[in-house]
């Protein structure tokens, strides 16, 4: 995170004695990235965060593995509206696509998740519809439609939906951050950035479980590069009375993104919202369109020779895909090796348009995306030929 926050009770100096009301000492825990060389936060626990009483292996659900190459190479259309789903926001995810850098999944659920810690990398979860309470050792974030919730590696958390929630899950192999070009050398958002610190929502207060539950042994599902482990802590891990630092979960709503408009059509990098290891996340939002009198206000045909384009259509009308079968909830995958662009007739139909209502989340990856079980299950077999109609 690019700025400092302090929540709850903390001592004036770090690494000093901080006493509980009963005279004991709070247990200090450093959550830090890149071996003490990057962002970190200090958390103060009522109980030892190191106290575990049991570990056991957990089989990885079949739907979270088993990607296959996009072969024969083709553009794809996944219809998430037709996916069968069960389980919660963690164990009920359906894997759409992935590679060694990022895994992209889909969840639709009204079931609270168990406690979970992803120790492989950061996650960003986009809430397509519904609302959910995100609980973690850092506190609570209430998230709803249009929110990106970004979760640092190693954060113990759970999801508690308020009714049915639909979400796109982005699991990185490293850290997800604001683009470097939006930040000063000291981490402040610059004036040209399409969003800033005021748009970000972190936990506003600690979440401390009280009573008998606090002292009950509590299981946490832990994901590492080696697989899944059920780790049972001696006490409930939601025992943090305060924390401070630059590393914490936060929410950013897509409606707070400030689109950049040019005289002629602007390329996707102007919509960039986050960056991860070998991928970027972009937000396409309602906006005025290009204002040159002869402008073509939809994308030109383009061949991204170094990246695959994964686009989740979340609201509005995406004019470039008119007639393709793409609808709200659809996903297009346009891989490197294929030139893509507007559907036939879309250019002519767009001329003279002054604004767009489109809203989409795009993930560009710089290594090829393989297709997951949910992608295969939901694929429209006719999409690749729609430009030839």
Predicted features along the sequence, with ranges:
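Jelly-roll (double-stranded beta-helix
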Residues: 1-389
